[in-house]
Each structure stands twice: as C-alpha cells, then as structure tokens.
C-alpha cells in the first residue's frame, strides 16, 4: 500500500539502516505537519489500530486528524508494533528542517527517507540519553570506516 505520507526515519531503525547492529523495538519517524500530510498519515495508520503506548486500556483516544494536529509527538502501539510519531526532535527540528539532511535507504524493500549519518549522530548527541551515547560510539565507528574505505 502506498500512502504518500511525508516522513523521515530517525532513531534506532535509522542507525540500523546505516549499519548499526543494535536492535530496536520501535520505529521513530518525524512526520511533516501539513494538514494534507496529517490526513494521509491518519488514513495510512488507521488499519493498524494505533493507540497510546502505556495508556490504560479503555482510555479514550481518537485517531483522527484533529488529535494529531492538536498534539506533536505520539508514542503509539499498533498491530505491527511500537511507533513513535514525532512532529520534531531535539537537535534537529521539524521534518522540513531535517529534509536537507536525509538520504534514501531501502528498508524492507521500500525506499525511505532516513536521517543521514552525520545528523543522526547530531540528534542522538542532543537527546543525551545513555542509550544514545552508546549508539553514537557505534555510529562514529561506522562513519570512520566509511571515510577510510572512501579514501
């Protein structure tokens, strides 16, 4: 199914796409916040029954464009797994801010926009969590190896 939702893969899946062996349990994406894109996003994810991750069962949550427009970042559980929908990220900003710092990667047979290696390191450093610092060391090693093989 092609949805034409505008988003950028960041986080652990982006690190994996760049060669990190570290496993992740969720998909983090920065989505573009235009009304049209939010409507496409809601339509595309509706069949996956998105619900707020960690919320008590039965807590009212309406998966609709108004909910997404009123919020910014959503940690969701879907029928396919965990998904973090991010309107912006620390150290990187919005989808439009990040767009110049993307590369196209193949993920499960699909071409996806993914944060480039330099910017992935930058935003992980800005996030400042212990798990990000561990990932930064791996990503910097990957970057050094690429630079050696390019020269």
Predicted regions and their residues:
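Compositionally biased terminal segments of proteins
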Residues: 1-151
């Amino acid at each position: 199914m092609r949805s034409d939702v505008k988003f950028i893969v960041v986080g652990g899946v982006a690190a994996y796409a760049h060669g990190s062996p570290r496993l992740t349990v969720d998909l983090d994406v920065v989505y573009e916040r235009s009304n049209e894109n939010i409507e496409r996003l809601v339509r595309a994810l509706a069949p996956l029954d998105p619900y707020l991750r960690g919320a008590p069962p039965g807590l009212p949550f309406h998966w609709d464009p108004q909910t997404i427009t009123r919020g910014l970042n959503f940690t969701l559980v879907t029928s396919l797994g965990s998904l973090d929908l991010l309107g912006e990220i620390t150290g990187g900003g919005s989808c439009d801010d990040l767009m110049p710092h993307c590369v196209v990667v193949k993920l499960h047979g699909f071409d996806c926009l993914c944060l480039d290696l330099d910017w992935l390191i930058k935003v992980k450093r800005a996030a400042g969590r212990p798990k990000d610092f561990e990932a930064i060391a791996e990503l910097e090693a990957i970057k050094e190896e690429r630079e050696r093989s390019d020269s």
